Swiss-Prot record:
This is Aspartate--tRNA(Asp/Asn) ligase. One of its GO terms (molecular function) is ATP binding. Signal peptide: none annotated. InterPro entries: Aa-tRNA-synt_II, aa-tRNA-synth_II, aa-tRNA-synth_II/BPL/LPL, Asp-tRNA-ligase_1, Asp-tRNA-ligase_1_N, Asp/Asn-tRNA-synth_IIb, GAD-like_sf, GAD_dom. SUPFAM superfamilies: Class II aaRS and biotin synthetases, GAD domain-like, Nucleic acid-binding proteins. ATP binds at R221, D222, E223, E486, G538, I539, D540, R541. It comes from the Bacteria. The gene is aspS.
Length: 591
């Protein structure tokens, strides 16, 4: 018999009754029923009930065992009485009568219990992550993560992609976030960087003649933490292909993700049609470039109904350049109580409130109610109702100003309305491609033109497009949203040096600076670079959605906390003075 186990804690069934077996695992819980000791023994695979009575030679030893001790037991498999069968576990028809027991690893008093559903502070869970990971939900999440990564790999191999590993230590490259810098001992005063993404390397692979590349890639970004984002590192399915169009990229990644969500989505519906929505329309309709399409609400511009109206706030606002009034329909939200709740929501978001109209039954007909309805009159109110397709029992909320200033709050209000009114389908994965991202934006204070999104995407229209108004230039850049989260981001790359130099020139970067920052890639593009493009899918977010977790740290093995600290490993830590001397560094305290 094997030194530690002949079976796992999920293997045994009624067919094994009478066999002598050996199990190893952790003590999930201990119970004393009338002098008979019961232990639920747990390993990675499942739970087996083991027991012994006072006549057993290991009874006294078993009395000493406590929760989360690691033990080995030998015993005989017994059938449970029919009334004691536990259908909730795979071994529920049997129990193991212990003949021998060995303590493999005793445990000190536990800072958190593995058994049960008790909640603990996140700081405690992260400090003792190895205990937290023993809990059933965390085991399930990590198994799911492993299975998702395996499925992604298998599908990419099946599609004839080659898996390559790109460097982890490289040059600093401004890609939208702060780099983690690594000082060089051999080159004092110079620094490497951990890659924010394998962006340049995967493009260089295309120049090197490899047609289809993928990698389960670690990415490192010094970012402020959010519930859906790790502050230091994350993993992505990184993809790049040569001689492809934007639609080719969509056609590759859609079946891959569809299979993953169908396979691991717990029976939720997976949309088969993935609409392509322009960035401009996404901002107008949803107030977000990662819309949640489970919510059917579409915002609309209603400026014409308020121009010159009796509602002076909106009428005066529309006289300013670049302003707009938008409506958020709320089917089923037609009560003053709900409208007041939404006003309170807007105030929490930093607004004075939201204008609203709601429609109610007045016996002989329909009546529009609310302060806006009184100010703009029945004709304008009716025109708004017809445009939005609303009726009795419905409402509409209104925000105005320069769209960039209110779109984010409008999007949050749309999401809140959808959840409050039960309009958002909780049993569905809804996908949408967001396309036609603007390449440039103007700083409202300085008037300076800078990149709004990926500077390496090919402008639609090529070099000719860059000769006109920069703010009208859109790129072959795309994101994939699912249920309000950005899952995929990608682009068809700007592989022509002359177009790249012009694109950067518009944003104020000269050719010399571009060569200095991106010299490796720019030089390579001078030697017959093929048209190429790709994307990257965030594995952490995919698993978070599939596991129905609101916090991304629930699907990462050893995450940092909100302050980018590893409480378990005490990172970041202060270096030894000798280490600093070797690197030619000195720590200057902040005042």
């Amino acid at each position: 018999m094997h030194m530690y186990r002949s079976h796992t804690c999920a293997d045994l069934s009624a067919q094994d009754v009478g066999k002598t077996v050996r199990l190893s695992g952790w003590v999930h819980r201990v119970r004393d029923h009338g002098g008979v000791l019961f232990i639920d023994l747990r390993d990675h695979y499942g739970i087996t009930q083991v027991l012994c009575d006072p006549d057993s030679p290991v009874f006294e030893q078993m009395e000493q065992v406590r929760a989360e001790w690691c033990i080995r037991v030998d015993g005989v498999v017994k059938a449970r009485d029919a009334s004691l069968i536990n259908p909730k576990i795979s071994t529920g028809e049997i129990e193991l009568f212990v003949k021998d027991l060995e303590v493999l690893g005793a445990s000190e008093e536990l800072p958190l219990q593995v058994f049960g559903d008790q909640e603990y502070p996140e700081e405690t869970r992260l400090k003792y992550r190895y205990l937290d990971l023993r809990r059933a939900n965390m085991q399930a999440n990590m198994k799911l993560r492993s299975d998702v990564v395996a499925s992604l790999r298998q599908q990419m191999w099946k599609a004839d992609f080659r898996e390559f590993q790109t460097p982890i230590i490289t040059a600093s490259s401004p890609e939208g976030a702060r780099d983690f810098l690594v000082p060089s001992r051999l080159h004092p005063g110079r620094f490497y960087a951990l890659p924010q993404a394998p962006q340049q390397f995967k493009q260089l692979l295309m120049v090197s003649g490899f047609d289809k590349y993928f990698q389960i890639a670690p990415c490192f970004r010094d970012e402020d933490p959010r519930a859906d984002r790790s502050p230091t590192d994350f993993y992505q399915l990184d993809i790049e292909m040569s001689f492809v169009t934007q639609q080719d990229v969509f056609d590759v990644i859609q079946p891959v993700l569809t299979q993953v969500f169908e396979q691991f989505g717990n029976g939720k519906a997976v949309d088969q049609e993935w609409p392509q929505i322009s960035y401009k329309d996404a901002a107008l309709w949803y107030g977000s470039d990662k819309p949640d399409l489970r919510n059917p609400i579409k915002m609309q511009s209603v400026s014409e109904h308020f121009a010159g109206s009796g509602f002076a706030i909106f009428a005066n606002l529309l006289e300013q350049e670049g302003t707009e009034i938008r409506a958020i329909p709320a089917p089923g939200g037609g009560s003053r109580k709900f409208c007041d709740r939404m006003n309170a929501f807007a105030q929490k978001e930093g607004l004075p409130g939201m204008g609203y109209i709601f429609w109610r039954d007045q016996g002989a007909g329909m009546e529009a109610a609310g302060p806006l309805a009184k100010n703009i009159g029945p004709e304008r109110t009716e025109a708004i109702r017809q445009q939005l397709g609303l009726g009795v029992g419905d409402a509409a909320f209104f925000l105005g100003g320069k769209p960039k200033a209110f779109e984010t709050v409008a999007g949050k209000a749309r999401n809140h309305i959808g959840m409050e009114l039960g309009l958002t389908d909780q049993n569905r994965f809804a996908f949408a491609w967001i396309v036609d991202f603007p390449i440039y934006e103007k700083d409202s204070e300085t008037g300076r033109i800078d990149f709004e999104h990926n500077p390496f995407s090919m402008p639609q229209g090529g070099l000719e497009a860059l000769q006109g108004d920069p703010l009208s230039v859109v790129g072959y850049q795309y994101d994939l949203s699912c249920n309000g989260y950005e899952l995929v981001s990608g682009a068809i790359r700007n592989h022509k040096p002359e177009i790249m130099f012009k694109a950067f020139e518009i944003a104020g970067y000269g050719e010399d600076e571009v060569r200095k920052r991106f010299g490796g890639m720019v030089n390579a593009f001078q030697y017959g670079a093929p048209p190429h493009g790709g994307c990257a899918a965030g594995i952490d977010r995919i698993v978070m959605l599939l596991a129905e977790e609101a916090n991304i740290r629930e699907v990462i093995l050893f995450p940092m906390n909100q302050r980018a600290e590893d409480l378990m490993m005490s990172a970041p830590s202060e270096p030894e003075s000798e280490q600093l001397m070797e690197l030619g560094l000195r720590v200057i305290p902040k005042d």
